[in-house]
Swiss-Prot record:
Belongs to the DNA/RNA non-specific endonuclease family. It comes from Saccharomyces cerevisiae (strain ATCC 204508 / S288c) (Baker's yeast). The gene is NUC1. It is found in: Mitochondrion inner membrane. The lineage of its organism: Eukaryota, Fungi, Dikarya, Ascomycota, Saccharomycotina. This is Mitochondrial nuclease. One of its GO terms (molecular function) is RNA nuclease activity. The keyword Metal-binding applies. InterPro entries: DNA/RNA_endonuclease_AS (IPR018524), DNA/RNA_non-sp_Endonuclease_sf (IPR044929), Endo_G_ENPP1-like_dom (IPR001604), ENPP1-3/EXOG-like_nuc-like (IPR020821), His-Me_finger_sf (IPR044925), Non-specific_endonuclease (IPR040255).
Length: 329
């Protein structure tokens, strides 16, 4: 799939309103303060609703309906969780040469677990993935969090997972993309990555109308299976010129399906504004265009095929190898 095909599908699928959770402490991820405040804007003075005894805000005395998004600050990443899809909206990482060089954690000591900070009725369950045909796909990779066991353990919360096709994607091309991101720390002293799911429309061949169609797993069905995933990469402070103020940027959108390792990574590159429209997120809006350089013009945006197979996956006793998913329409 080339970038121009992806662009045709990147239409407005907004993620919703702003965050309603605030962090109390960077290193205390479970200390989250809920602030579901009702709107404070005064009604239009031209509307004389008070004359007719109309007060819609009176509903708030029973509770504010939301939406509520769970913003959590872990050691290695920050995530914003979507209670409706039971997937993250986005996960934000920061990797450096120093963080990747550390070897203070072992994946075999980490286990997939439910995120009990999220209310039970809104969180993914371990049983939801069992025999679903999908991998529990890390959005912040465990391999990026070897600097502490706690950091690595945090990546195994299901709130950091999305259902991903295993063979040909999560265990292959997607893993190669994650390795590409880590490799950027050889040229840049700081690399920031935003990763998340997408639910993009597809043209119906019968009536030529675009529709969003995705599977939902679990019992009862509750976890949405993304059609695509995105990565926004921001590379800072090149080793050759660490004082440089501008940043090198690239955005990629990949389908949640097997991808041949022969496919060029640049085939999945998309403009940032197209990614914004498809996610409803504002990305790098504080950075002037003159300060944003094209990453793929500074480095060779190409995956390096490595044999990830299932070696790392088998190290965790909690991980079950899953059969391939049913083919989506």
């Amino acid at each position: 799939m080339c970038s121009r095909i992806l662009l045709s599908g990147l239409v407005g699928l907004g993620a919703g309103t702003g965050l309603t959770y605030l962090l109390l402490n960077k290193h205390s991820p479970t200390q989250i303060i809920e602030t579901p405040y009702p709107p404070t804007q005064k009604p239009n003075s031209n509307i004389q609703s008070h004359s007719f005894n109309v007060d819609p805000s009176g509903f708030f005395k029973y509770g504010f309906p939301g939406p509520i998004h769970d913003l959590q600050n872990r050691e290695e990443f920050i995530s914003c969780y979507n209670r409706q899809t039971q997937n993250p909206y986005w996960v934000l990482e920061h990797i450096t040469p120093e963080s990747l060089a550390a070897r203070n954690a072992d994946r075999k000591n980490s286990f997939f677990k439910e995120d009990e900070v999220i209310p039970e009725k809104f969180r993914g369950k371990l049983r939801d993935y069992f025999r679903s045909g999908y991998d529990r796909g890390h959005q912040a990779p465990a391999a990026d969090a070897k600097f502490s066991q706690q950091a690595m353990d945090d990546t195994f919360y299901l709130s950091n997972m999305c259902p991903q096709v295993g063979e040909g994607f999560n265990r292959d091309y997607w893993a190669h993309l994650e390795y590409f991101c880590r490799g950027l720390t050889k040229k840049y002293k700081s690399v920031r990555i935003v990763t998340g799911p997408l639910y993009l429309p597809k043209k119906d061949p019968i009536d030529n109308k675009f529709r969003v169609n995705y599977e939902v797993i679990g019992n009862p069905p509750s976890i949405a299976v993304p059609t695509h995933f995105f990565k926004l990469i921001v590379a800072e402070a090149p080793t050759a010129n660490p004082a440089r103020e501008d940043i090198a940027v690239a955005a990629f959108v990949l389908p949640n399906e097997p991808i041949s390792n022969e496919t060029k990574l640049t085939d999945f590159e998309v403009p940032i504004d197209a990614l914004e429209r498809s996610t409803g997120l504002e990305l790098l809006q504080k950075v002037p265009p003159s300060k944003k350089k094209a990453l793929c013009k500074e480095v060779n945006c190409q995956i390096v095929v490595r044999d990830f197979s299932n070696a790392a996956i088998k190290q965790s006793k909690d991980v079950k190898l899953l059969p391939p998913p049913k083919k989506r329409n």
